[in-house]
Swiss-Prot record:
Binds the 23S rRNA. It comes from Microcystis aeruginosa (strain NIES-843 / IAM M-2473). Part of the 50S ribosomal subunit. One of its GO terms (biological process) is translation. One of its GO terms (cellular component) is ribosome. Keywords: Ribonucleoprotein, Ribosomal protein, RNA-binding, rRNA-binding. This is Large ribosomal subunit protein bL31. Belongs to the bacterial ribosomal protein bL31 family. Type A subfamily. It holds the Pfam family Ribosomal_L31. The keyword Nucleus does not apply. GO terms for molecular function: rRNA binding; structural constituent of ribosome. NCBIfam families: L31, PRK00528.1. InterPro entries: Ribosomal_bL28/bL31-like_sf, Ribosomal_bL31, Ribosomal_bL31_A, Ribosomal_bL31_sf. PROSITE patterns: RIBOSOMAL_L31 (PS01143).
Length: 77
């Protein structure tokens, strides 16, 4: 069996977000740079914005002509 095939394990790897140390984890890299983590993500901080998707659905229905309830197959019967 080949020896030394596993990467080096860093049990105290630093997770850095915006130049600030946010936590330590175990990793195969000594430093991990992230843009978003649970401390600044809107879902976890309670600053989540609700997105109005009704306009998107209406646009989809118009685009594929699914907006009307009566279909041609139903009229032919």
């Amino acid at each position: 069996m080949p020896k030394k095939i596993h990467p080096t394990w860093y049990p105290e790897a630093k997770v850095i977000c915006n130049g600030e140390l946010v936590m330590t984890v175990g990793s195969t890299k000594p430093e991990i740079h992230v843009e978003v983590w649970s401390g600044n993500h809107p879902f976890y901080t309670g600053t989540q914005k609700m997105i109005d998707t009704e306009g998107r659905v209406d646009r989809f229905l118009r685009k594929y002509k699914m907006g009307d309830k009566s279909s041609k197959k139903a009229d032919q019967k």
